[in-house]
């Protein structure tokens, strides 16, 4: 009897897993790069213009938009839940406290412009996905086809911010966090290459520069000048070579033990991803190809489609019922 019950339980669990996978696959299949071609033909150019203007004023915004999209997708899927100004929501959780406020402002501003042209048509989730792509392009990086048709969540998911891997993560923890989202080791290393642009706060890397041994000594010393052992909010570039230009220098830094975050250097620390880092460091084309493919995969995580969710009229709050 115990064996029979166990078999039934296993079968039931398999049915649930398969059903969930099919549901996610079906939702992704409903996305299309031409989704707004008829309903809001000016949407893509409006987003691009808004991002280019913002990046021209502050280059860091390009990286901030990319990070915002990543944080959105890793929490319950790419549904703009991260944009909600809920006093107890995702924005209040530790992993999101260092998100650049300017990125939220840019998305909200673009949304207002899109709403003026096409009321109630383009979702905040899609605007953020496209803005992340355009931010990379504005900093000299590659473009990729963003599939569209996501809808916006009707709630925030603060408890699921634990899905975001912290900067203190080991390689094993990183691989597990990405695997949970059906992203493999190559995807993980490629998406980490987003750190070729942007900055991090001292509190995110103080442990690495004071406690770790797998860091270039001179590099660590230079960082300590503006980052005390106790931490703080002072900023340092994630890529010391070309901090405002998207490229593969991030991986070259890792080969020299100049990864800013503990989790960065874990990618090249006598582990299973060393060869991938070396490949990306030596071939910009290999990195670009892997990065764009991984961005498409990440952008398709758990989208709300059809009649699920809503098209928010303002990104930071839910529509009035």
Swiss-Prot record:
Q: Which reaction does it catalyse?
A: 2 a phenolic donor + H2O2 = 2 a phenolic radical donor + 2 H2O
Which residues are modified by glycosylation? Answer: 85, 96, 211, 270
Q: Where in the cell is it found?
A: Secreted
Where along this sequence does the record place binding of Ca(2+) 2? Answer: 196, 239, 242, 247
Function summary? Removal of H(2)O(2), oxidation of toxic reductants, biosynthesis and degradation of lignin, suberization, auxin catabolism, response to environmental stresses such as wounding, pathogen attack and oxidative stress. These functions might be dependent on each isozyme/isoform in each plant tissue.
State the gene name recorded for this protein.
PER42
Residues spanning the signal sequence: 1-29
What S-S linkages are listed for this chain?
40-118, 73-78, 124-315, 202-227
Which top-level group of life is the source organism from? Eukaryota
User: Bound how, and how many: what does the cofactor note say?
Assistant: Binds 1 heme b (iron(II)-protoporphyrin IX) group per subunit. Binds 2 calcium ions per subunit.
Q: What is this protein called?
A: Peroxidase 42
Q: Give the binding site residues for substrate.
A: 165
Residue numbers binding heme b: 195
For the keyword Metal-binding, the answer is yes
Species for this entry:
Zea mays (Maize)
